[in-house]
Amino acid sequence: MTQFLPPNLLALFAPRDPVPYLPPLDKLPHEKHHNQPYCGIAPYIREFEDPRDAPPPTRAETREERMERKRREKIERRQQDVENELKIWDPHNDQNAQGDAFKTLFVARVNYDTTESKLRREFEVYGPIKRIHIVYNKGSEGSGKPRGYAFIEYEHERDMHSAYKHADGKKIDGRRVLVDVERGRTVKGWRPRRLGGGLGGTRRGGADVNIRHSGRDDTSRYDERDRERERDRRERSREREKEPRERRRSRSRERRRKSRSREKEERKRTREKSKDKDKEKDKDNKDRDRKRRSRSRERKRERDRDREKKEERVEAEVPEADDAPQDDAQIGDLGIDGIELKQEPEEKSRERDRERDRDREKGEKDRDKDRDRDRDRRRSHRDRDREKDRDRDRDRRRDRDRDRERDKDHKRERDRGDRSEKREERVPDNGMVMEQAEETSQDMYLDQESMQSGDGYLSTENGYMMEPPME
């Protein structure tokens, strides 16, 4: 390719001049000449220091020991600082603490972007606020970073108590605040968090000493959340494990599942039909009971009407008997043999009572008979449905057993066919005999399949027997 380039470009591809040869400065090891041979050091041993007079070896500090020492020194230094600050700490003489301590509310975990006006808007719903003080880093109020907590002084103590009860956990600017009373000036022996006090125990030491949730938090709520998270994680892992299994399943299993779902749907349909029938029967029974009740009510009303009419008639007859002369009445009261006879109205009333009792007993007997008849009818229907379900389950079980037996027969036939093929490969002379045997076995297998498919089954597909749809 380069031979076609012009000379000015070919000059660019020309090789450089070779590097001039210079002899090496150092000699090779075999070329070096040693003026003096190697010699021993025995004459110089007396010049060395005696090992017994040597100082003991200094032990160096390992990395782990150094880290442990620094940690221990830091803890001791911090404890000393806390003791010094505790001596000078006095919340009652704090110039920043103003107002009534029993009306002041402490708000922690406040968002750094939350302003005083936002806090006033959120906490003014519980009552009028006298003063709000957001705590900033020392010497940077108004321009520096806030510490994340504030003090709110209410005009009334009841408003502070209301805010203490209801404002805890309220979300302000995307963060849930923690609300508490001011404890520095109200609780004796109280120490702030920076001096080793406070409500929380989240910074005592390691994971075995610390508690996870501090202050007024309801730990049971967090425990429930952890439990729910663990449950969700377990379910997700279970679903992840299921997915590859489902992918590995073959097409025949899917067909089997479809047929099973079809069977379930058919069973469900039959159950729904039987339920609908039961509902209709119950409705008919209810209507019958209602009609019977209405008939009994009408009968009762008619009886009451008849009784009232008879009583009116009797009342009309009684005064006529009173107007008759006493002698006639006395003669009427005595019989032929001088026996006293009862008056006619009393007999009528007694007859009427007897008839009424008889009718009542008869109505109750009829009612009992109707109830018994309905109960027997319901029982017979229920028993019939149960027997049908039992027969249906028995048929299904029998069909399943038949399927299993048929699958076993198919497997045996396949195994026999494989064995005959192997035998044929081994013994080529008997090839014709084996072919005939195989053909006869296949014909028998086909006949058996046709017979079995005609016996309550439609067809075979991938070794799975399909049931005909239920009528």
UniProtKB/Swiss-Prot annotation:
Domain RRM: 103-184
Subunit structure: Component of the U1 snRNP. The U1 snRNP is composed of the U1 snRNA and the 7 core Sm proteins snrpb, snrpd1, snrpd2, snrpd3, snrpe, snrpf and snrpg that assemble in a heptameric protein ring on the Sm site of the small nuclear RNA to form the core snRNP, and at least three U1 snRNP-specific proteins snrnp70/U1-70K, snrpa/U1-A and snrpc/U1-C.
One example GO MF annotation: U1 snRNA binding
Comp. bias (Basic and acidic residues): 60-78, 210-246, 262-288, 299-316, 339-428
The protein's name: U1 small nuclear ribonucleoprotein 70 kDa
GO biological process: mRNA splicing, via spliceosome; regulation of RNA splicing
Any one of the GO CC terms: U2-type prespliceosome
UniProt-annotated stretches for the region Required for interaction with U1 RNA: 92-205
One Pfam family from the record: U1snRNP70_N
Location in or out of the cell: Nucleus speckle; Nucleus, Nucleoplasm
InterPro entries for the chain: Nucleotide-bd_a/b_plait_sf, RBD_domain_sf, RRM_dom, snRNP70_RRM, U1_U11-U12_snRNP_70-35kDa, U1snRNP70_N
Biased composition (Basic residues): 247-261, 289-298
Highest taxon of the lineage: Eukaryota
Biased composition (Gly residues): 195-204
PROSITE patterns per the UniProt record, alphabetical: RRM
Region (Disordered): 48-78, 190-471
Compositionally biased intervals (Acidic residues): 317-326
Keywords: mRNA processing, Nucleus, Ribonucleoprotein, RNA-binding
Domain notes: The RRM domain mediates interaction with U1 RNA.
Principal place of residence: nucleus
Chain's role: Component of the spliceosomal U1 snRNP, which is essential for recognition of the pre-mRNA 5' splice-site and the subsequent assembly of the spliceosome. snrnp70 binds to the loop I region of U1-snRNA.
Entry annotated with the keyword S-adenosyl-L-methionine: no
